[in-house]
């Protein structure tokens, strides 16, 4: 439970920093700083190794490089949770997994209904299916102990399943032309990671070097480079036979949490959330992509997560999180519509970082996420007050009964 509390603490604090980074990006893009901001994002950085080198603008180093670190952390969390955490027990994963399925299907259907006549726009169908765990937990942190820990764990587990679905979606639907040569290099790296794991190698540097080479190979192969982070994480040992109490996976996960929560995600938000509001009019806001995205996040997510979860509980496939009620569960479902960084990331893959929709697509992500966050916060705060009032009323009734019994005696 200590690991879960630490995770929640990091993600919640990081969520607040994400909000600050988002506001900063919006201010930069919509003030006299806009030219400087855009030139800064286009600044090229080159890393060379002899005759080999990589030269990319800052925004791509962030989206392909830093986000690979984020997905590496997601991979570590997935492995740990499956082997000894919340995902180990089928009964514990049932409700979040079913809720995540609803949160994937319904938003995608809503987006499809709005964009089915435009094949290019339809490519962004996965944009409203994502949940930003850092932002969502950041909002939850504002409510403090009024939200049961069981609900926070439910949201965290649902978001992890959500991230797993995002990984599969990126691999299947957002991969460009493939390079057989680079895929072969990546395969050799995979074999090397497997060998390091089986031989019980304890050097983090060895895994880092092989992982870095694999990242470059995957980047050059046509498969999105972030997937290298996930795959590499699966080969990090969770324990060693001769030192069962030592875990390389947990050690790396612990070291990375702070860097990702307070560095990677805020930087990603700052370079991707710079939405220009100058060219966005009513026509753009009411365009199929914008409506499909905003309604997919705000309506689709809450309807999908709550309806699937509600049916799972009613048909006894899963149980309501301990100490919670259906209003609180609905509040969490609404909060799942905070797609923000993950939605922006999928948006950049779907539309190749173009401004084809005059920033209306990104603005829709921002609006859908903000409205979902605000509505979820209000619902959870309201349900917490009601629950406190009911508990107080029950205490008064119990005290009254006890007093009557004492008088009779």
Swiss-Prot record:
Any one annotated GO CC term: plasma membrane
Membrane topology summary: Multi-pass membrane protein
Reaction catalysed by this enzyme: Na(+)(in) + 2 H(+)(out) = Na(+)(out) + 2 H(+)(in)
Annotated keywords: Antiport, Cell inner membrane, Cell membrane, Ion transport, Membrane, Sodium, Sodium transport, Transmembrane, Transmembrane helix, Transport
Residues annotated as transmembrane: 13-33, 58-78, 93-113, 120-140, 153-173, 176-196, 216-236, 256-276, 279-299, 326-346, 363-383
Pfam families documented for this protein: Na_H_antiport_1 (PF06965)
Subcellular localization, as worded in the UniProt entry: Cell inner membrane
A single GO BP: regulation of pH
InterPro entries: Na/H_antiporter_dom_sf (IPR023171), NhaA (IPR004670)
Gene Ontology molecular functions: sodium:proton antiporter activity
Family: Belongs to the NhaA Na(+)/H(+) (TC 2.A.33) antiporter family.
Physiological role: Na(+)/H(+) antiporter that extrudes sodium in exchange for external protons.
HAMAP family in the cross-refs: NhaA
Protein name: Na(+)/H(+) antiporter NhaA
Organism this protein belongs to: Campylobacter concisus (strain 13826)
Organism phylogeny: Bacteria, Pseudomonadati, Campylobacterota, Epsilonproteobacteria, Campylobacterales
């Amino acid at each position: 439970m200590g690991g879960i509390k630490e995770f929640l603490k990091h993600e919640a604090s990081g969520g607040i920093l994400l909000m600050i980074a988002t506001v900063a990006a919006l201010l930069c893009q919509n003030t006299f700083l806009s030219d400087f901001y855009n030139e800064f994002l286009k600044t090229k950085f080159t890393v060379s190794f002899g005759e080999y080198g990589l030269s990319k603008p800052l925004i791509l180093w962030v989206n392909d490089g830093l986000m690979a670190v984020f997905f590496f952390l997601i991979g570590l969390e997935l492995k740990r949770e499956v082997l000894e955490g919340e995902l180990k027990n089928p009964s514990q994963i049932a409700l979040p997994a079913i809720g995540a399925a609803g949160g994937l299907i319904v938003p995608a259907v809503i987006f499809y209904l709005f964009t089915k006549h435009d094949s290019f726009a339809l490519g962004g169908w996965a944009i409203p299916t994502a949940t930003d765990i850092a932002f969502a937990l950041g909002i939850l942190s504002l409510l403090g102990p009024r939200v049961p820990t069981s609900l926070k764990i439910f949201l965290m587990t649902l978001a992890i399943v959500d991230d797993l679905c995002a990984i599969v979606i990126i691999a299947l639907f957002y991969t460009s032309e493939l390079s057989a040569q680079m895929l072969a290099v990546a395969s050799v790296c995979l074999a090397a990671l497997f060998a390091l794991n089986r031989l019980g190698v304890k050097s983090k540097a060895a895994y880092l070097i092989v992982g870095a080479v694999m990242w470059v190979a995957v980047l050059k192969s046509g498969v999105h480079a972030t997937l290298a982070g996930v795959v590499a994480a699966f080969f990090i040992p969770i324990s060693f036979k001769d030192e069962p109490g030592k875990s390389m996976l947990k050690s790396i996960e612990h070291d990375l949490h702070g860097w990702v929560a307070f560095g990677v995600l805020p930087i990603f938000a700052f370079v991707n959330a710079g939405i220009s509001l100058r060219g966005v009019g009513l026509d753009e806001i009411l365009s199929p992509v914008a409506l499909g995205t905003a309604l997919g996040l705000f309506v689709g997510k809450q309807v999908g997560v709550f309806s699937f979860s509600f049916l799972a509980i009613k048909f006894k496939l899963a149980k309501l999180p301990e100490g919670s009620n259906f209003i609180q569960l609905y509040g969490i479902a609404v909060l799942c519509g905070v797609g923000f960084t993950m939605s922006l990331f999928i948006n950049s893959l779907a539309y190749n970082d173009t401004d084809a929709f005059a920033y209306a697509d990104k603005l829709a992500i921002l609006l859908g996420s903000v409205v979902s966050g605000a509505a979820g916060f209000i619902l959870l705060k309201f349900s917490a007050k009601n629950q406190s009032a009911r508990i107080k009323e029950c205490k008064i009734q119990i005290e009254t009964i006890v007093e009557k019994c004492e008088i009779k005696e």
